[in-house]
Every structure is written in C-alpha cells, then in structure tokens.
C-alpha cells in the first residue's frame, strides 16, 4: 500500500484564511499582523489577559531513534482530538531549524494528517524569526570586534571572548575559525567559532522573555567575555542592548498558523533540547493560555532533556503549572532499546519490546517525580503488530499507567480521541507539580540531582576546566541559576550507544557556559556539539523545487 508523503498531504489540504482561524479563538483583526493569507504574527499587547488561564498539557517522549518518534505529530494530533471533542484548544510548537531540515529530519511540522500548515513556509523561512535572531547574534559579534578594534576601552581579553557567531545550518567546518586576519585594517585577529542558531543565547532569551522590556533587560545581562583580570563583560557594558532588541521587535511576536483540521497553532521559537532548553516561547504559551482552555505544547526529545528543562527552566520562569504530561512511545524505539539493529526494527519482536520497556518506564517515572501523572501515547506505525502493542498495554495495566494507542498520523484528530479522553481525566484531577530542585542548591548539586534522579547515573565528574568554572561562577554570583544540560538525546547517559535504562554510570561535565542573559548555566557533557554536522547523505539530496515554485522532498 502506497502512502502519501507528508508534503503531499499538506499540499492537498484546504487552508482557512488566517483571519478566520484567529477569530475562532477571539483574536481581533486589530491584533493580527498577516504574513500573506495563511500565517500571521500576533500583537500580544492587544490580547486581553484572562483570569482563568488555559491548562497546559506537555508532550514529551521516550529516548528516540534517529528518525524521531513523532512527538510533534502526536502534539498536533492531540490538539486536533480535543478540537474533535469540541474543546477550546490551541497547540503551541517550536519553529523548525533549517539545519536539521536539510540534514536528517526533512522538516518538523508534524506528519501525516496531524500537521501544522503551511508546511513549506514553516519548514523553510517562515516569518523570518530565525533570520532576526541570527542577525542580532552576529551583530553583537560585530560590535564586540569593533570595540576591540577601536581601542578596547573595556579591556576585553580577546582570548576570553565567550560569544560566538551563529548560522541556521549544520556546518561542522565553522566550529573553529580565525577572524580579523589580513592586517590592521581588518580588525584584531582572534579565535572564534560558530554555533547553530538554535543554540544562540539570543534564541533562549527570545523564548524566555515576557515583553520587549524583558527582552532588552535579558539581552543587557548577556556575558560576552572577560577582561584580562577575569571580570565579566556584558552587553550593557557595550551599550548595544537597545539595538539588538530593535532587531528582534517583530521576531518576539508569536506566529499564528493552523493544523490540517483548523486547530489554531502558535509556532514560535526553536531552541534544541539537547544543546539548549528545548521549548517554544513563553509568550506563545501564555498567549495561548489567554485564548484557549487547553494548550498542548511539546519539549524536545525525552523527559531527560526537553521535559526536565520545561519544568525546571521554562515553567519556573513563566510561573505556570502543568496539568498533564503525555509520553510518546513507539514500538520501533522500544525494540531499539531492546537491542534490535536499525535495519531490523520493522520485524516483529515482542521479546525486544519487553527488553526495551525499561526505557519507557524510566521516562514515566521521571514525570512522576515532578508531581504530574503521565499518560503514555503509543504512536502507531504501519509495521507495528498486535502482539507488540498488546504487550505494551499489558505492561501499562500492570503498572497502573494510563495509556492510549494513537493513530493521528493516519486518522488526524479522530485517531487521538482515546488519548484526549485519558488526558482530560488527568487534567480534571489536582496534582502537586513542582520543579526537581531548588535554585538555592549549589550548581554542582543541581547537576548531580539531574544525573542521579532523572538519568539514573551514580556520579558526576567535573573536568579541571569545569571545576575552575564552578568556582568562578560562584564568585560572580551565578550559583543560583537553573542548569541546562547539554547531552545526547539517544541515551540517559552521555554515551549515545548506551541504550535502554542504564544505571551506575558516570557523567563527565567537560565545560560550563554561563548564559546570564537567559538566566541558566549550560553543562556540556560527553561529545555534544553546539554546531552539528550534516550526515553522509543529507535529506537535502532528495529536495528540489518545481518550475512553479513548490517544494519537493520536505517530509
């Protein structure tokens, strides 16, 4: 049986005018800034806050296969299912990054009949937010180099500049570069490097800001480097926070689009969860809470990454609670964690599902540690067998875990009604949502708490560089920030080949980065990179554009 591609399904779908989508949740035309017929930005100053804000449902996942487990698909499909049940609902997602789109993912707007549209636009340049973030980031680099070239009044040590340039592309050749070469007229030579745009602190700040004033304040607190006597230098010292905020004045506004079934969707911000905090913007989530009774959102990768950061960074900063958490599981991921090779994942193997269930079990238990009852969604794939699915259901029943088979890829919202009903039961019950740790704990103890309680590790080892940074950060007054772990998404450990639910392992913190503007400390583990590379056969090889301007190969 031949199935339509995600792009084919998207192209065959009928879009409603964006003003009609806006009107369905009470957004006035005065608050709408259209970008064509089917997408718009929202002027949040013209949205009336409501006292009884919508309840937030977070979608996370078990540790994924390289292809992903359909978390965005389930997020959109669950929102469509609530829509099917006549609930007042919105979905809030991150924006896709071009690097992974051309690399391995091929797009990130959901899949099948559970997508947000217009799919081509969202996956490519959308409303220009990533370009604005890239420009603001690189403008700061230019201001830093110009300051040094023009006499270096602040005494910046060019050997200790922490700020890097960024590009919205996977490009390993740019990880380490030299700038300022070619003689005195071209600036002061120094080592530099590029991160991918989604790892930029500007991206994190945009996603954690509540207003333009908040954006400007956070930008002013960015630590760009140090003086020769190791004193931090901030954007406020350079006096360019106003200029950088001006570049972002439109990017900070949430983007409104729609699902295939007409569910209103806010797609805004896009930090990765393995190298950044992995959540869409607070502004988008809060705007949705002012407009809808239920807000379905997602956080990148598994409970060990995006979900943990959602609870300990985003929800803490925004000041809202979670009503429910959905953990997406797939039969293929369970088999992978049960020891099955990638090429054999389509073959029935109930024993491997049994062996791999420990990974899902740990993710479920992780959510419980935050005081919220999880609901498991088995995201159905065509190669799943009844025996494999029934084993997972029986495991859930034995362990008193809520579960639903979810067929939103094939059936849209109708395929998610069982899941929606399970989530509604959880939403109606009180919970004791809380972060994992208190901010007053020392940085090393916060890291140890994440590693031992969420990852299942036994010990954290800090490199000599990280130990010096811990001491320096404490002296600088940065000890009370939350922690943002940078770690492989494929394993609970820092070794991506260690699958299942390993325990007793050590995690090494090789380096720390102070994101004093965003307000968290990044702890880099293992071989994690903040500028990815492309695979041997990138998804770009299958992409093209027709003579009449339609994309081919986005999936």
Swiss-Prot record:
The keyword Nucleotide-binding applies. Keywords: ATP-binding, Ligase, Nucleotide-binding, One-carbon metabolism. Belongs to the formate--tetrahydrofolate ligase family. It catalyses: (6S)-5,6,7,8-tetrahydrofolate + formate + ATP = (6R)-10-formyltetrahydrofolate + ADP + phosphate. Pathway: One-carbon metabolism; tetrahydrofolate interconversion. This is Formate--tetrahydrofolate ligase. It comes from Staphylococcus aureus (strain JH9). ATP binds at residues 65-72. One of its GO terms (biological process) is tetrahydrofolate interconversion. PROSITE patterns: FTHFS_1 (PS00721), FTHFS_2 (PS00722). It comes from the Bacteria.
């Amino acid at each position: 049986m031949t199935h339509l591609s995600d792009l084919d399904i998207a192209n065959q779908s009928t879009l409603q005018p964006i003003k009609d989508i806006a009107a369905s949740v009470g957004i006035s035309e005065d608050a709408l800034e259209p970008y064509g017929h089917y997408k718009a930005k929202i002027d949040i100053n013209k949205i009336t806050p409501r006292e009884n804000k919508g309840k937030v449902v977070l979608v996370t996942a078990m540790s994924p296969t390289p292809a992903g487990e359909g978390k965005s698909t389930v997020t959109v499909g669950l929102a469509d299912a609530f829509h099917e049940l006549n609930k007042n609902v919105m979905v809030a997602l991150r924006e896709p990054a071009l690097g992974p789109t051309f690399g391995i993912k091929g797009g990130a707007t959901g899949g099948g009949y559970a997508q947000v549209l217009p799919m081509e636009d969202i996956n490519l340049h959308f409303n220009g937010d990533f370009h604005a973030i890239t420009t603001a980031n690189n403008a700061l680099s230019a201001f830093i180099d110009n300051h040094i070239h023009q006499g270096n009044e602040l005494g910046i040590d060019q050997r200790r500049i922490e700020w890097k340039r960024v590009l919205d592309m996977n490009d390993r050749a740019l990880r380490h570069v030299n700038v300022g070469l070619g003689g005195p007229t071209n600036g002061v030579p120094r080592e530099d490097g590029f991160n991918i745009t989604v790892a930029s602190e500007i991206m994190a700040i945009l996603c954690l800001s509540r207003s333009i004033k908040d954006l400007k304040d956070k930008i002013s607190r960015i630590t760009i480097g140090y003086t020769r006597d190791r004193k931090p230098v901030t954007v406020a010292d350079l006096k360019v926070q106003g200029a950088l905020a001006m570049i972002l004045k439109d990017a900070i506004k949430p983007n409104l689009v729609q699902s295939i079934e007409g569910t209103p969707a806010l797609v805004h911000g896009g930090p990765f969860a393995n190298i950044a905090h992995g959540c869409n913007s607070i502004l988008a989530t809060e705007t949705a809470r002012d407009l809808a009774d239920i807000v379905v959102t997602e956080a990148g990768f598994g409970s060990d990454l995006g979900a943990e950061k959602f609870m300990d960074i985003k929800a803490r900063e925004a000041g809202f609670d979670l009503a429910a958490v959905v953990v997406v599981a797939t039969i293929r991921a369970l088999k992978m964690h049960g020891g099955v090779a990638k090429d054999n994942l389509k073959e029935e193997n109930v024993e491997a599902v049994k062996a791999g269930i420990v990974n899902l079990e740990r993710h479920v238990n992780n959510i419980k540690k935050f005081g919220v009852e999880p609901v498991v969604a088995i995201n159905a794939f065509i190669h799943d067998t009844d025996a494999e699915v029934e084993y997972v259901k029986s495991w859930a029943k034995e362990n008193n875990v809520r579960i639903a088979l979810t067929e939103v890829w094939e059936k849209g919202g109708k395929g998610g009604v069982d899941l929606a009903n399970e989530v509604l039961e959880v939403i109606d019950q009180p919970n004791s949502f809380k972060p994992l740790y208190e901010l007053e704990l020392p940085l090393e103890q916060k890291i140890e708490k994440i590693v031992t309680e969420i990852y299942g590790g036994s010990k954290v080892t800090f490199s000599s560089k990280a130990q010096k940074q811990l001491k320096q950060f404490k002296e600088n007054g940065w000890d009370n920030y939350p922690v943002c772990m940078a770690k492989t998404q494929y394993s609970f450990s820092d070794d991506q080949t260690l699958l299942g639910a390993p325990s007793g392992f050590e995690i090494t913190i090789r380096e720390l980065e102070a994101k004093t503007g965003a307000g968290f400390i990044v702890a880099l583990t293992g071989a994690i990179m903040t500028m990815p590379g492309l695979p041997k056969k990138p998804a770009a090889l299958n992409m093209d554009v027709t003579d009449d301007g339609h994309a081919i190969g986005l999936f």
